[in-house]
């Protein structure tokens, strides 16, 4: 079985654009304040360079990332779960006072201009994942053999 390909330039390869542009969800692994690991599913947007996701300051996810910015995201192709980009890096937070971050996610996933579920007083932040390494995995055919989907190895 071939190893995943490193993109070497910290960019998602074009062969995986459909995964990050689609209405798929990311699994975000992070470190909790006590040193144990946590993994959460998040909705996200990708701007062609960075993956961004949103959370409330009251959530554990925010507390985890405020203490340790290291993350690993995996976004699986729902039709072929062995095909995915993995993005490792640091999640940098910005206040989302104008709600543009969460509203862009609402537009992508709900086709709504404004995210409808925040309550008065909710403090929202957007995390931008600055990649340190990106890997892109192959598709595995139904017979179990790997298919090369055009990722160059070097």
Please place each PLM-identified region on the residue numbering.
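Charged, gly/pro-rich active-site loop segments
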Residues: 1-11, 83-154
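Short, basic/aromatic recognition patches
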Residues: 2-26
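Hydrophobic alpha-helical segments typical of transmembrane helices
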Residues: 12-16, 61, 101
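Short secondary-structure boundary/capping segments
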Residues: 17-18, 43, 63, 117-119
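Short beta-strand segments
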Residues: 23-57, 63-65, 71-75, 84-86
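Short, surface-exposed beta-strand-loop junctions and turns on beta-sheet-rich folds
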Residues: 59-61, 80, 143-144
């Amino acid at each position: 079985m071939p190893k995943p390909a490193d993109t070497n330039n910290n960019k998602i390869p074009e062969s995986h654009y459909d995964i990050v542009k689609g209405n798929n969800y990311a699994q975000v692994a992070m470190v909790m304040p006590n040193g144990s690991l946590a993994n959460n599913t998040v909705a996200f947007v990708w701007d062609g360079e960075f993956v961004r996701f949103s959370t409330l300051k009251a959530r554990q996810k925010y507390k985890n990332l405020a203490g340790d910015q290291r993350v690993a995201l995996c976004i699986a192709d729902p039709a072929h779960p062995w095909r995915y980009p993995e993005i490792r890096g640091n999640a940098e937070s910005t206040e989302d006072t104008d709600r543009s971050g969460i509203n862009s996610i609402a537009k992508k996933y709900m086709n709504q201009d404004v995210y409808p579920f925040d309550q008065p007083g909710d403090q929202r932040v957007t995390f931008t994942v600055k990649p340190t390494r990106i890997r892109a995995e192959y598709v595995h055919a139904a017979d179990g053999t790997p298919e090369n989907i055009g990722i160059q190895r070097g």
